[in-house]
From Swiss-Prot:
<feature type="domain" description="tr-type G">
    <location>
        <begin position="8"/>
        <end position="283"/>
    </location>
</feature>
<dbReference type="Pfam" id="PF03764">
    <property type="entry name" value="EFG_IV"/>
</dbReference>
<dbReference type="InterPro" id="IPR047872">
    <property type="entry name" value="EFG_IV"/>
</dbReference>
<dbReference type="Pfam" id="PF00009">
    <property type="entry name" value="GTP_EFTU"/>
</dbReference>
<dbReference type="Pfam" id="PF00679">
    <property type="entry name" value="EFG_C"/>
</dbReference>
<dbReference type="GO" id="GO:0097216">
    <property type="term" value="F:guanosine tetraphosphate binding"/>
</dbReference>
<protein>
    <recommendedName>
        <fullName>Elongation factor G</fullName>
    </recommendedName>
</protein>
<dbReference type="InterPro" id="IPR020568">
    <property type="entry name" value="Ribosomal_Su5_D2-typ_SF"/>
</dbReference>
<dbReference type="InterPro" id="IPR004161">
    <property type="entry name" value="EFTu-like_2"/>
</dbReference>
<feature type="binding site">
    <location>
        <begin position="81"/>
        <end position="85"/>
    </location>
    <ligand>
        <name>GTP</name>
    </ligand>
</feature>
<dbReference type="InterPro" id="IPR000795">
    <property type="entry name" value="T_Tr_GTP-bd_dom"/>
</dbReference>
<dbReference type="GO" id="GO:0003924">
    <property type="term" value="F:GTPase activity"/>
</dbReference>
<feature type="binding site">
    <location>
        <begin position="135"/>
        <end position="138"/>
    </location>
    <ligand>
        <name>GTP</name>
    </ligand>
</feature>
<keyword id="KW-0342">GTP-binding</keyword>
<dbReference type="InterPro" id="IPR005225">
    <property type="entry name" value="Small_GTP-bd"/>
</dbReference>
<dbReference type="GO" id="GO:0003746">
    <property type="term" value="F:translation elongation factor activity"/>
</dbReference>
<dbReference type="GO" id="GO:0005737">
    <property type="term" value="C:cytoplasm"/>
</dbReference>
Length: 692
């Protein structure tokens, strides 16, 4: 498909927020008003266009990032609707990696919620400029101004309201546009498609002027000449104000705040205008850096159709009609169907069979895609999430994505022999789609173990096995994904010697193992001098260490956060080999760690409970009984919000306890925060249970 819009008229955006803040509804309204959707789909009746998986329509939450393209005011907007449930944070992470800008949706009643903070931090990590939409102002208890304060206090940014609401709750009728200084009022009978500009109501003139003054003063800081003109009493033109707001948004000086109610069809068109006016085009980003394969040399890929092709695969999905689809963001050059592209990450050539422009679950075949496009490729054999595609003549390796370690695991067993044959294929395909989902086999029991980010995550995997692959499975109880770590530094020397006629095996290794800071991972360093261990045998030692690390020593859980230094060793000209040094490395590392004392680590979750005040005492008492540590307590409207750090092992089945103690009136959310050493009595229990 030949280019229809110049690159400066592209907007690649994500819509993200906490669960139930109204992201999918907001996206539905955007598709409706931009002409892509002839009927508005509602999340609560299971008809939302973007929520196209069966599980999503049943549960009313967005699980996978659906991509769609729409058009507004002669601009092309590629939207990715991302999930707000903490178990699917990986979807947000990989979407942000390929987006230029983001819209953060907030619930006007709840304000900034835990997952709002999580996605905000993710957007900070990838330096994604953003605007906010304070949604659901039609609901009882909504408070725009309190929400703006929460954005400032909790997210550590400078909010810049460019609108304020006219009316609130049932009386919400429109917004005051602080850039135009006009009231924008919607006509209810036209499903929000029609509105008119009016004079600002008398009762809002004073507060509108206050926020307008703050807006202008913050905006003109982006332009010295305009700042001078403003200080001299000159009126700032609307187009100059828009330019200043855009500049400040792109350089992270502030975050524009819009508002309304997507469900009540108010405020969506001005949000679209803000996307066009204030979020970046690929031209504003300019380029992306990669490296030359096999070296550290930096390669700059300019966002330009005329340069070599480069793209990042950010999602793999199974489509019931097309098969495996690989979603890519094109950073430079052009790609056409029928041509070959080079997968730098795998050093393989891929052929592009079909290329599709996606609209949630419908698709349009295209022959060509260009810089800035987000498209899906069918028929790729080797490419998975995070891989780079490019021209073989101009190879580049773009920075891959980082994926979190799973915190929960369950055993799954096929119900019949027929299911057994299909289960391996099903789990393999699901793991290819979702890098935060892992599949392993327990060597002793032969069981298949699936690992993920939470109970809901694994729930949906099992559900998809059944629906999409017709695999029936028995599912075990959820287990915590513990880790092992080192308490103290330790040094040990080990000699591996085996003689059984003919060539024997000989390897001597001396290792120093040291604990490292949490989150630092694993590292192995060689300080061998004088050829005590020849270079070709060092990988054997490293492999031995890795094998023991992966399988664990204390209780069979992977080891993390340590450093190993290979200090010395000895080899034999005939009897030494890579295998001999691998076996020596394994035994030496295991003994050194045992002498250094091993400790079990457990995932600790950040839990936020929103409860009526009447039940606060019971909720806090219950969290304390779960080894929880209360971090904060605050009032939010007529509810109390309790934040606590609680070990995941003590959170299974929490929803039922919370419903029971609050008569169904309290709710909670949780996400992984960090790994922490377990108390000795818990460690003894876990190791005893595993020992059987």
């Amino acid at each position: 498909m030949a280019r229809t819009h110049t690159l400066n008229k592209y907007r690649n955006i994500g819509i993200m927020a906490h669960i139930d803040a109204g992201k999918t509804t907001t996206t539905e309204r955007i598709l409706y008003y931009t002409g892509k959707s002839h009927k508005i789909g509602e999340v609560h009746d299971g008809a939302a266009t973007m929520d196209w998986m069966e599980q999503e329509q049943e549960r009313g939450i967005t699980i996978t990032s659906a991509a769609t393209t729409c058009f507004w005011n002669d601009h092309r907007i590629n939207i990715i609707d991302t999930p707000g449930h903490v178990d699917f944070t990986i979807e947000v992470e990989r979407s942000l990696k390929v987006l230029d800008g983001a819209v953060c949706v907030f619930d006007g009643v709840a304000g900034v919620e835990p997952q709002s903070e999580t996605v905000w931090r993710q957007a900070d990590k990838y330096k994604v400029p953003r605007i906010c939409f304070v949604n659901k102002l039609d609901r009882t208890g909504a408070d725009f101004y309190r929400c703006v304060e929460m954005i400032k206090d909790r997210l550590g940014c400078k909010p810049l309201p460019i609108q304020i609401p006219i009316g609130i709750e049932a009386d919400l009728s429109g917004v005051v546009d602080l850039v135009k200084m006009k009231a924008q009022v919607w006509k209810n009978e036209a499903l929000g498609a029609e509105w008119e500009y009016k004079e600002i109501p008398d009762d809002l003139k004073e507060i509108s002027q206050k926020y307008r003054t703050e807006l202008v003063e913050m905006a003109v800081e982006q332009d010295e000449k305009l700042m001078e003109a403003y200080l001299n009493g000159e009126e700032i033109k609307e187009e100059d104000l828009v330019k200043c707001i855009r500049k400040g948004t792109l350089n992270f000086s502030f975050v524009p705040i819009t508002t309304g109610s997507a469900f009540k069809n108010k405020g969506v068109q001005p949000l679209l205008d803000a996307v066009i006016n204030y979020l970046p085009s690929p031209i504003d980003i300019g380029s992306i850096n990669g490296t030359k394969p096999g070296s550290e040399d930096v390669v700059e890929m300019k966002f330009d159709d005329g340069t070599g092709f480069s793209a990042l695969a950010f999602k793999v999905a199974n489509d019931p009609f097309v098969g495996s689809l690989t979603f890519i963001r094109i950073y430079s050059g052009t790609i056409r169907t029928g041509t070959a592209v080079y997968n730098t990450s795998k050093d393989k050539e891929e052929r592009v069979g079909r290329m599709l422009l996606m609209h949630a679950n419908s698709r349009e075949d295209i022959k060509e895609a260009n810089t800035g496009d987000i498209v899906a490729l069918a028929g790729l054999k080797y490419t998975i999430t995070g891989h780079t595609l490019c021209d073989e003549a101009n190879p580049v390796l773009l920075e891959p994505m980082e994926f979190p370690e799973p915190v929960i695991e369950i055993a799954v067993e096929p119900k019949t022999k027929a299911d057994q044959e299909k289960m391996g294929e099903a789990l393999g395909r699901l793991a290819k789609e979702d890098p935060s989902f892992r599949v392993t086999s327990d060597e002793e029991s032969g069981q298949t173990i699936i690992k993920g980010m939470g109970e809901l995550h694994l729930d949906i995997i099992v559900d998809r096995m059944k629906r999409e692959f017709n695999v029936e499975a028995n599912v075990g109880a959820p287990q915590v994904a513990y880790r092992e770590t080192l308490q103290n530094a330790s040094e040990f020397e080990y000699t591996h010697k085996k003689q059984s006629g003919g060539a024997g095996q000989f390897a001597k290794v001396k290792l120093l193992v040291e604990p490292q800071e949490p989150g630092s991972g694993r590292s192995v360093e060689s300080k061998i001098k004088g050829g005590a261990i020849p270079k070709e045998f060092i990988p054997g030692v490293e492999k031995g260490i890795e094998t023991i690390s992966d399988g664990g020593i204390l209780a069979g859980f992977p080891m993390i956060d340590y450093k190993v230094t290979i200090l010395d060793g000895l080899h034999h000209d005939v009897d030494s080999s890579v295998l001999a040094f691998e076996l020596a490395g394994r035994a030496c590392f295991k003994e050194a760690c045992t002498r250094g004392t091993l400790k079990l680590l457990e995932p600790v979750m950040r839990v936020e409970v929103v409860t009526p005040e009447d039940y606060m005492g019971d909720v806090i008492g219950d969290l304390n009984s779960r080894r929880g540590q209360i971090s904060t307590q605050e009032n939010r409207g007529n509810a109390t919000v309790i934040t606590a750090m609680v070990p995941l092992a003590n959170m299974f089945g929490y929803i039922n306890s919370l419903r029971s103690m609050s008569q169904g009136r309290a709710q909670y959310s949780m996400f992984f925060d960090h790994y922490s050493k377990v108390p000795q009595n818990v460690q003894d229990e876990v190791t005893k249970k595993i020992a059987g």
